[in-house]
Amino acid sequence: MPVTCLLSPTEYYQKVVALFQQKGDPDRAQGQMWYMRYQFEYFGIKAPEWLALAKTLFDEHGIPEGAALLETARLCYEDDHREANYFAIEMVQKVMKQQPENLIDFFEELIITKSWWDTVDWLAKLVGMHFLRFPHLTKPVTERWMASGNIWLQRAAILFQLKFKTKTDTALLFDYIRRIADSKEFFLQKGAGWALREYSKTDPEAVAKFIRETALSPLTKREGMKWMVKKGV
């Protein structure tokens, strides 16, 4: 039986921080901060460890519901430590299949908050899962993201189909990559190449043709062709 959460959002957040502080390694935290260019603080907990701690918290205290879920996640995301930010996403992911369609607004909020590839790429995956549940959201939301000028929303709009394989809306993917083809932003060039590389495993002919016929950055082309070159396709 799932545990009913009886903690307030603030109490839950305090439990998360207390446990993560207790289990953190300051020396490891220094290395983590260096790797992420000192943009975020860290408790010094590796992914398998904080995931295990998250499971402990979920098992003991349950997961908040309704507005309390988002309020708790938001408090964790406001914390300076990246592991607390990760916990927020993990908690929402655990129950996202029970959430309404407007959860997309919360995902958008997180994408543009403390934005970096680690959280944005994870959130893009969750966005894709959400769009599979609510397909009518896909085009209007991602069109708005592409028009926003925010590189992280644009990256998410390009990456949300990463694991869709035969379910990929090819026209949408190619259209969005064309729109940012002249961008000098590394994370857009790299993201576009990554999306093309993944889709090349499903339809190499379509990807090869697109790369041939589209003026893409050298980085995007190189990344997009990587799997096909390796496989000799």
Where are these regions (language model features)?
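Alpha-helical scaffold domains
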Residues: 2-233
